[in-house]
Design a protein with these regions (language model features):
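Acidic/His metal-coordination segments adjacent to aromatic residues that form catalytic metal sites
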Residues: 1-13
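Carbohydrate-active enzyme catalytic cores, enriched for enzymes
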Residues: 16-157
């Protein structure tokens, strides 16, 4: 989990983030359910901040900031609901709600972890997604990144 330090950026882009982080979230959920604690693993440097990495890596027109060998199409990431559950930051789900509104049924059918959204997002209100306050985000780490935008809901921003 050291790759998330110090600020939550992931070295290989958001496709690999989704793959690796989804297993982290499932493991942390399982041990927390079994033992009542995740033994501080979610508190490791950068981990709880990494949801912001994905939030900011998706553009207002629902494309990915594509680097490494990742594609440019944004995708539904059920793991973002785990980050919502842990942080109670409703804005972390902003892009997920937009993606679902665009073509959610198609996206859910293709996602192996879609049922986890029901568990991790049980307390989320998705009817009126909270627009994130920050228009920029930067992170150091294995592959430093900086994302900037002028708006969350203007597709040309």
């Amino acid at each position: 989990m050291g790759h998330y330090a110090p600020d939550g950026a992931y070295p290989e882009g958001i496709g690999y983030w989704d793959y690796g982080t989804s297993f982290n979230a499932m493991f942390l959920s399982a041990i927390e359910k079994a033992f009542g604690t995740d033994y501080g693993l979610s508190e490791l440097p950068g981990f709880l901040k990494t949801g912001e990495y994905i939030l900011h890596a998706v553009t207002p027109n629902l494309k990915n900031f594509a680097y490494s060998d990742n594609g440019g199409t944004a995708f539904l990431a059920p793991t973002m609901f785990w980050f919502y559950d842990k942080t109670k930051d409703a804005s972390i789900l902003y892009n997920q709600v937009q993606l679902y509104k665009k073509d959610g049924q198609k996206r859910i059918k293709k996602n192996r972890l879609a049922p986890a959204m029901l568990i991790w997002g049980a307390s989320a209100s998705l009817a009126n997604p909270q627009i994130p306050a920050r228009l920029s985000w930067k992170a150091q780490g294995d592959n430093p990144v900086c994302f900037m935008r002028s708006s969350w809901n203007d597709s040309s921003a």
